[in-house]
Amino acid sequence: MGVLLRRFISMTSVLSVCLGLSACTAAEAPAPAPTTETRTVPPMHTLPPLPDSGDIDPGTYLVTSFKENFEITVPDGWVSEDGDGLGKDDPDQPDDLGVFVGWWPSNHVPRDACKWQGSLVELNPSAKAFVDAMTAQTSTASTPPVEVMVGDYPGVEFDHSVEGDVDIKACDNGQFCVHSEYSNLCTRWYSSTAERETYRVVNLDGHRAMFWVVQFHESINPELAREARAVFDSIVFKLREVSS
């Protein structure tokens, strides 16, 4: 990532030498003394890595979960969850997690989010494969994908939620599975029909990066919902800088 890239360029002049002794005479002007010119690119500011767990200080952090690193800016009061997401409680409902921004890689999407056991399909690493699988998923509703830029890289954004009145307790393993890192168990599921997500799926030159912001219940504090969206929007990838 450009913010971490440090490159130093050194340019050295070529010395003029006499190739044949017969061509060098006392009458000729002496060859210039060798010189060396050095240009140094000042190192760019290096961002701290996002802590793996616990309360984190407000600021901008670097995350290395994907093919390219990304930056995320976090206000006060957020907690890091295993380095794969950030959560914050709703002050109006302190017993429940209010919002979450996640980004762990998932390579499997079930054809049916409720009857998901045996239907987890392995995906190729492209962004399109994940978007197509999610928007075609049975038992869920998705908005049409909209093209976005996530820093210097293109992607798409769409909303995702439970379709209709699904009895989640009756789903396989009591989980409403939307995607997973594995073929035989679920690593991202809804616990209630009230959960709502917005996804951004980024194309990193043929490789996928994916992010989602979650609202866990309908009566979420509006200020907290706006704050979660701001954290989600702060995620950016930057092209590596090239010096010449």
Question: Where are these predicted regions, by residue range?
Answer:
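General secretory precursor processing signal
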Residues: L19-L21, A27, R111, W116-S119, ...
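Short glycine-rich, low-complexity/disordered patches
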Residues: T140-G151, L239-S244
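Generic structural motif
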Residues: T36, A141-P145, G155-E157
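Second-shell loop/turn segments in exported
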Residues: G118-V121, P144-P145, Q215-P222
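Mixed-charge, low-complexity intrinsically disordered segments
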Residues: V162-R200
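Secretory pathway targeting signatures of secreted, lumenal, and periplasmic proteins
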Residues: L62-A136, E147-V156, S161-D167, D172
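Alpha-helix-centered segments that form part of catalytic cores
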Residues: N124-T135, A141-S142, Y190-V201
